[in-house]
Amino acid sequence: MLYFLYKILNINILNYITVRAGIAFFAAFFLTAFFMPRFIAWAKNKHANQPIYELAPQSHKAKNKTPTMGGIVFITATLLSSLLCSNLTNTFVIGGILCLFGFSFIGFKDDYGKIAGHSNHAGMSPRKKFMYQIGLSFALSIILFLFANLSGEFFIPFYKYALFNLQFFAIFFWMLVITASSNSVNLTDGLDGLASIPSIFALVSLGIFVYLCGHSVFSAYLFLPKVVGVGELCVVIFALIGAILGFLWYNCYPAQVFMGDSGSLSVGAFIGYTGVVSKNEILLIIIGFVFVIETLSVILQVGSFKIRKKRIFLMAPIHHHFELKGWNENKIIVRFWIIALIANIIALTTLKLR
């Protein structure tokens, strides 16, 4: 809407992506901060509480009365702010909005099933949820390849030129990146605020890359891939950052609400989507280092048990391992935040070191 006001009324300041991204950030933050306590009160009244996994550390038993599905509020705030501030004719923006909405809907169906069944196992089956994720990721990849004309060029960190062009096979690569990113954030979302700050760090880094890749002068100077029109996605990125900050106000320890799958699946998928459109699919390993470690811990744990009948960790994902080792929850959370910050600083150095 604001972008079209610039077109109609010739309000030049609204032409700037940075201005509209700033407005979207504050709009999403205040919308989330205003509606979240009302959602918490409603959820408590409806007993929409987070079912606790029976094998979870004992400290988690006290959280069984905490409302979940807070992701509905901050994703809705993100979508409203994006609709208000972004150029809705931009294909990258349309794809980003569809990504947030679609994965949040998948997460909502899973959350609702768990709440209705009063069990952590009562949601969608892992196979069904995975198929939905793959299907939506494939659709988004088709949009990027056919309608956004996104190149299939493959880049790696610290090297300025594309290694090769995946051509049509880029669709399947992007599909895997978006799906993997969605699940990795979902696995990380196990402690109060643990997924929120690393997500914000990742989105800030990706927002910088997206803006620079969409800018003809900066992309040429820094030897970044030029992606025409992708800079507009910054509006959606910073709307989501503002919304997550608004959510964190109520999710910091001790949490008053959890984001649930309706939040974590959506945030993770959008991080993957943003990495794809900025041609940073491999750099996502550094940008989302905490998410990668959490996911690897689960893969190693399951693989080790199936092959060796032995577990590597006391419990996976790895943040539960540290809980069972006696670490305080706050210590785990803050240390993971520090790791995420360092990883993203390293990722940003690739802007010049290439």
Swiss-Prot record:
Protein location: Cell inner membrane
Matches recorded under Pfam families: Glycos_transf_4, MraY_sig1
Lineage: superkingdom: Bacteria
Any one GO molecular function term: UDP-N-acetylmuramoyl-L-alanyl-D-glutamyl-meso-2,6-diaminopimelyl-D-alanyl-D-alanine:undecaprenyl-phosphate transferase activity
Keywords: Cell cycle, Cell division, Cell inner membrane, Cell membrane, Cell shape, Cell wall biogenesis/degradation, Magnesium, Membrane, Metal-binding, Peptidoglycan synthesis, Transferase, Transmembrane, Transmembrane helix
Its membrane topology: Multi-pass membrane protein
Location (main, coarse): membrane
Keyword Magnesium belongs to the record: yes
Keyword flag Cell inner membrane: yes
Name recorded for this polypeptide: Phospho-N-acetylmuramoyl-pentapeptide-transferase
Cofactor annotation: Mg(2+)
Top EC category: transferase
Pathway(s) where this gene product acts: Cell wall biogenesis; peptidoglycan biosynthesis
Record-level GO cellular component terms: plasma membrane
TM region(s), chain numbering: 23-43, 66-86, 88-108, 138-158, 161-181, 193-213, 227-247, 257-277, 282-302, 331-351
Catalytic reaction equation(s): UDP-N-acetyl-alpha-D-muramoyl-L-alanyl-gamma-D-glutamyl-meso-2,6-diaminopimeloyl-D-alanyl-D-alanine + di-trans,octa-cis-undecaprenyl phosphate = di-trans,octa-cis-undecaprenyl diphospho-N-acetyl-alpha-D-muramoyl-L-alanyl-D-glutamyl-meso-2,6-diaminopimeloyl-D-alanyl-D-alanine + UMP
Function according to Swiss-Prot or TrEMBL: Catalyzes the initial step of the lipid cycle reactions in the biosynthesis of the cell wall peptidoglycan: transfers peptidoglycan precursor phospho-MurNAc-pentapeptide from UDP-MurNAc-pentapeptide onto the lipid carrier undecaprenyl phosphate, yielding undecaprenyl-pyrophosphoryl-MurNAc-pentapeptide, known as lipid I.
